[in-house]
Amino acid sequence: GDFTRGGFTHGMTRGSRHGDEGLKIGRETMQPLWDFMNEAQHDQKPFFVWYAPLLPHDPHTPPERLLAKYRDLAPSLHVARYWAMIEWFDETCGALLQFLDDRNLADNTLVVYAADNGWIQDPGSPRYAPRSKQSQYDGGLRTPIMVRWPARAQPTDSPHLASSIDLAPTVLHAAGVSVPPTLQGINLLDAKAVASRRAIYGAVFTHDSQDITRPAASVRWRWIMEGHRKLIIPNPAREPAAVPELYDMTLDDEETRNLAADRPEEVKALTRRLDDWWTP
């Protein structure tokens, strides 16, 4: 819908969830971002930017200068296009960070990178491959979370578990705003809290909501990641033929060897923790 429905004062998208005018951001121009931040600086006001281009989302239409770099390296033209789209997106992110640096805004600006789902490009079509987007596997669930704040966050690569539900408490803490006790997630800038986390949880829903007033009606799978173990529990109402799946993500990060039948006690223990988190 219209960007104003989300509480934004400025924006491009007015109808389609896949862009309409918003499709131009990143692909054709970054000027609306520059204009917005320049206006905020002129008015001496803090600003919030949600930069969410359809990059590397389809349509995969990268410029030839980027596609040429991958045409002979990728296993297919579809994959080459996707790789080029990723670099195109990287370029625009770099331009955004450079804008902040050039105006001495970086030290007072928290930048958070997140994605809504993973994507494994199907070599034989323009679509995503199985076991990626909309699946219960890491190809669809595992995405990068990056934080940039030169004045407060030193560059590092954390081996600990993080979740998208951590973004809200992280931003609230950074802004000095009290975090409601009912809000799930932890502050990712708190190294002690991150290191002490035991597990993360999640659910995979149908693409379209089955009942907007009852989220449980759309659940396909629930999952828990504890250390190197990942358990996936199907919703029998949605996936009647599916079985529980247990994987050792250190030894089998592509989730091809289901250990559930061999480790029933682990399945029971992890299922209890998953049920304690949420039982639809």
Regions found by a protein language model. Name each.
Residues 42-49, 105-111, 196-197, 226-229:
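Loop/turn elements at helix/coil->beta-strand transitions in domains of secreted/extracellular proteins
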Residues 33-82, 117-130, 265:
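Active-site His/acidic residue clusters
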Residues 1-32, 129-132:
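Catalytic-site neighborhoods of secreted/periplasmic enzymes
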Residues 48-51, 56, 145-146, 171, ...:
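A short aromatic-rich beta-strand->coil structural motif
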Residues 119-125, 131, 153, 165-168, ...:
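C-terminal cap/loop subdomain of S1 sulfatases and analogous C-terminal strand-loop tails that border
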Residues 98-153, 163:
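Histidine-centered active-site microenvironments of extracellular/periplasmic hydrolases
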Residues 19-21, 78-84, 132-136, 152-162, ...:
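Active-site rim elements
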Residues 30-38, 68-109, 174:
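A long, amphipathic alpha-helix that forms part
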